[in-house]
Amino acid sequence: MNRIMLRGIQCYGCRSHVIQSFLAIADITFPAPLYHKPYTRSHLQHQSSFSSLHGQSFRGQSVAHSTSSRDPLEDNGTEQHPDSASHQSNEHVPWYLREESSEVPPHPLGSRQSIPPLPDNPPPILEGLLQHISVDIGLDDLSLLDLRSRNPPPALGANLIMIIGTARSVKHLNVAADRLCRWLRSTHKLHPTADGLLGRNELKIKLRRKARRAKLSSNAGSAFDEKDDGIITGWICVNVGSVENGKAAATEQKQDFVGFGSVADGAQIVVQMLTEEKRAELDLEGLWSGNFPPRSASEIRMFEQHFEAFAEKAVAEAANGRAAHRDPRGVRGTGSGMDHGQRRGLHTIRRVPNISVEAAVLGPAFIPRQGATVQQEPRLGPAPSVPPKASKPLNLSPETASLLHHLTQVPKDDAIRELGSGPQDLTSTLFLRLFQEALSNAEQNPDAHILAKLELIRVAVTLQHPHYSKTDLFDAFKEFAASGYDISESQALKTVKALLSFAENDPDGSHTAKRVSRSDIDLALKVLNHMSLRGMDILSREVFSMLYTASGFQVPVRPVNENPSPSSIETETSIPVSAEEFDEVRLVQDRLRKIMDAFDVKFGPDQFLTLLRFHFHHGNYDQFWAIWRKMSLLQLPRSKEFYVLLFRLHAERGNQKRAAECLSSWVPMMAREQPAVAIDADVARVIMACLLVADPDVKQRADNGDPGEYPSLWDRCWNVLVASKATQG
């Protein structure tokens, strides 16, 4: 009978209810039915499936019937907890019975492919052009700059609209520019021009030739010059030309307008296509939007009024100044009857104006260049006296210099204790009392305390004193600059080096990647700007070396998006940083390197050591080896210090593959250097540390007498260390 009853019930859900009723009598628990979770279907789906429609109507009756049939049994003790039933139903709902969510998750690339909104009164061609650039050509991150209100207009033309887009590669950049020009010619009958675009086969041929030259240079053992040769510029500017402009609001034409020709009515559209790296480097949006805000007619009139008032005030002050500087005794008359207040003459001395503290550093436009002999015209009457401090530099007294030198020789903790509690502390320690006494005894130069204060704060900042800040150092430099004395180049470089120094590590020993803050870099750049106006060459190798080091991290780092192999211990010796911060440092490095190449900055051995360490710590191995090989091309000898640094960096990094390549390639090259680099005790220690990274069992293999490259090199270094200890003993 049960078989006949089940055969009559065609719905699977109804069969489940019947079986559930029999199992409940036997006190057997059964998972909650799946159809209890409400499931909605569209109207079209209900009409398309008769069986599902019939099942839904029959299921409702069976549900009510089964519920009523189970009520008496549930009262007898077979009741289930409602929370457990709902929890089981949530766990056992299959994917084909789940409700479809109305909210569709956004695509990760959707924001990059969005089309910017149209400006007010757009040209008729603009909407179709944006659609074609985004959909058909495939440029990402489109931005639109409406420059039609610029006054004066940009050099590209009046009523300019600029579209900026990012190409996915250099090949995509050339293909996109070529297709856009062809589309404009065929569809809109325009004559666009594309600056930087190469032909379809020209780019392929030039890239093939460049790859061939690079391969030949690599086989010959020389470095390939990767300067910009015009092939891979990463930037193409497509000038669409003059198109019909949108209908603008009627404006009154200026009555006093003077000029030739008619006012331009059409709009100029320019499409800037760049690669992602080139767009981040140029930052066209920031250049056009931030530094040059649009000026309306009212703003221009207000500016003209302010300028006229400023000009009248300047003329009045100049007239008062001429009257005040005239000779009160009068001037002998001449037959010509000239106004001697306007007479010109020749100066034989230099007049140094009084300079305020803020104008000395933040606005030093009127500071004379050091060492410049200016021949000016003497005024009628007594010549103004020249301050004696402007003719010679300010030097420290021997007692003050000796105290500062002693501070650098004592241990760091003792030096910090002797410096007291800050710049305002003058008598809390014996050193500060002796320092103030030495300043008071310097009677021959009462302004010596200005330079002494600067040097004291500089030493404190270099020692990482907690109560001496870099702002105090900058204020001391401003006071020294306002005093009128000449600032030597060594004093300025020491100040910049202290401002660009890294902060001390945390006392709790937390591993964080330290960087110089942007505010400290701004202070250092202000000092360099002031010194450039005084005649100092700030494009020197020392300045670039300090800026290059301050732009990065203090310790070895790696981006968090990289997944090194678990067998390598490189993860233990490098600190993970965010990919955005890592890319920012790389971008600053590239810009500094391009500036150095443009000005042909020649580095010395000390700067090369700093650059090599910097690039290796930041994982820029290609640039590290490019600088290493460039030294031989510049005929700079790679001395013992360079090879000690090379092997120590690979040993500290802990990468087995790189350590093995370094040992096999550069240990034999030490004997070929001019002059040759011998393996002494210092070199032997770093080579043995590098050997332990490349082969952790090299010591046991060498003790067992195994033949091989690494055991023999280990024995050689061990013998050098034994001989060195015997010589010292």
Swiss-Prot record:
Descriptive protein name: ATPase synthesis protein 25, mitochondrial
Subcellular localization is given as: Mitochondrion inner membrane
- Protein's job: Probable mitochondrial mRNA stabilization factor.
Gene Ontology terms, cellular component aspect? Answer: mitochondrial inner membrane
Which keywords belong to this entry?
A: Membrane, Mitochondrion, Mitochondrion inner membrane, Transit peptide
Q: Taking the first listed entry, what is the main subcellular location of this protein, grouped into a coarse class?
A: mitochondrion
Q: Which gene encodes it?
A: ATP25
Q: Name the GO terms of the biological process aspect.
A: mitochondrial gene expression; mRNA stabilization
Q: Which organism is it from?
A: Uncinocarpus reesii (strain UAMH 1704)
Chain intervals with Polar residues compositional bias: 59-70
User: Which region of this protein is its transit peptide?
Assistant: 1-60
Q: How does it sit in the membrane?
A: Peripheral membrane protein
InterPro entries on file: Atp25, NT_sf
What does the sequence similarity comment in the record state about its family? Belongs to the ATP25 family.
Asked whether the keyword Ubl conjugation is assigned, the reply is no
Chain positions covered by the region annotation Disordered: 50-90, 100-119, 320-343
